[in-house]
Each structure stands twice: as structure tokens, then as C-alpha cells.
Amino acid sequence: MSNSILKVPDQNPQEIVALFSQQEAYAKLGKYKDEIWDVYQKVFIAALTTGETVLAKKCWNRLNDRFHKSPRVEGLYGMFLEATASEKDAMSYYNSKLSEDPTHTVIYKRKLALLRSMGQTKECIQGLINYLDTFYNDLEAWAELADIYVSVEAFESAIFCYEEMVLLQPFEPRLFARLGDLYFVLAQSNATNYWFSLKHYCRSVEICEEYFHGWFGISKCCQQLLELSRTELKRLLSKVNEKISDTFPDTESVRQLYQLSLKKSDLFAQKQPKLKALLEQC
């Protein structure tokens, strides 16, 4: 067990709560100095997760005493209401705060999260769209909107979200790989999208050569393309070239790329035994 609450993973809320209780009992919280406020927030969330609402309220009170009416503290109180009161009470609280300050981003996001948890997907989508009209640069909000679109199988809308994220972070390989994933899904009904999927996977490994997700995606795309008949492959390639001006690889290039992706995957597997086991299942 770590002796620092801040180093305990958020996925271990019981350990966080136990360590806090121990250190508080032995008056060891002073060692955190200015980081004590991060400790209180971490313990607050962990306590809500484990159902220890008395401890959660105590942590919130200390944060509120120090940062009264701050956006972060008000957002945490909304989380407390979600866990201890009714959804209606929490929503009323969020609406009240937004009527005071429509630009309160923390509260706005908490409200949207609550809408999603309540199954009000359409309202959540519209709320995120409205939010992004004002706060376009919020990558987290774009990712949330994309995730919701994927959950309702609106893959083309999800692609739009990731394309917007790419504009904000053009050198993030994970975004291009995710675009590759989405085009791969669309390719199940329209094989032309294998080319677009391949293009984005290739861009992800161009940015980061050691990015396994990208190489694995390349191997899957190439495998699908090589299983097509030569006539069908040429027909798809002509369709792709009609849509965009990019030069896509020919059949031989796809074959070479496939072999390269397999070699790369083998190298990753040699370094990571667990990854090797997963690859053997694919």
C-alpha cells in the first residue's frame, strides 16, 4: 500500500478511504501541505464511490471552507447530491446554478453527465452541441459527444467529432487510430471505407511508430482488402480516388504494408507477453 493518498489509483477507492482514515487518525495529513486540497477532493470522490457519505460531506465541507463558491466546489456538491439525493434534486441544483451563471462550465458538464446517466441521450447530445458552440476548444466535450454517438451507432457523426478533435490536436496518434476504428466499422456495409480506415491508421503510426493500435488496425484493414477479388479491389480503388485526391496504395503496396504490420505486431508481442496472448485470440 502506498503511503501517499495521491499516488493510490482512483480505481482503488477503498484503499484511498482506508489510508485517509489512518493518516487522519495519526495526524499525518500535514505532510501534504498545499496538496491537502487535492487529497480532500480525491477522498471525497472515493468516499462517494464506496458509499461513505459522511466522510464525503466532511471532505466537501473542508474544501468549501477554503474555496467557497468556487466552480470546482460547486461541481463537487452536485456530485454529492447525485449520490445522496434524487436525480430531480441534483438537476434542480444544476439548473439553479446555470441560471445564475450560464457559462459555469463545471456545472454544465455535470448536468450533461446526469442527463446521460438518466438515459436522456437526445437532450445530452443537444446540450453538448450547444456547449461546443461556445467552448469549441474543449477536447473532452468533443470526446464525450463522440462516445455518445458511438453508443447509438451514429458512426458518421462520431467521425465528425474526431475530425474536429484532430484539428485541435493534429499530432495525437490516438485520435487518428480512433478514426480508423470508426471507418473500419462503416466498412462492414461499404468496403470503400477500408481505404479511409487504412489511411488514418497509417497516419497514427506515422506520428508514433511504436503505436501498436495503429499497426494492428493496419493489419486488419490490409487483411480485409487482400481478401477481396482483384476486380473488386480495383473497383473500390477507383471509387476512392474519385472521392479524394490522395494517392492510395495499390494491391502490391497493401500486401507489403500487411507484411510490415505483422512484423511490427510480432515485435510488440515479444516485448509484452499479455499482448501476445491477446493477438493469438484474434
Curated annotation (Swiss-Prot):
Its main location: cytoplasm. Gene3D superfamilies: Tetratricopeptide repeat domain (1.25.40.10). Keywords: Cell cycle, Cytoplasm, Nucleus, Repeat, TPR repeat. Coiled coil: none annotated. SUPFAM superfamilies: TPR-like. GO terms for biological process: protein insertion into ER membrane. It comes from the Eukaryota. GO terms for cellular component: cell division site; cytosol; EMC complex; nucleus. InterPro entries: EMC2-like, TPR-like_helical_dom_sf, TPR_EMC2, TPR_rpt. It is found in: Cytoplasm; Nucleus. TPR repeats lie at residues 16-50, 71-104, 139-172, 174-211. May be involved in cell cycle regulation. This is TPR repeat protein oca3. It comes from Schizosaccharomyces pombe (strain 972 / ATCC 24843) (Fission yeast). The lineage of its organism: Eukaryota, Fungi, Dikarya, Ascomycota, Taphrinomycotina.
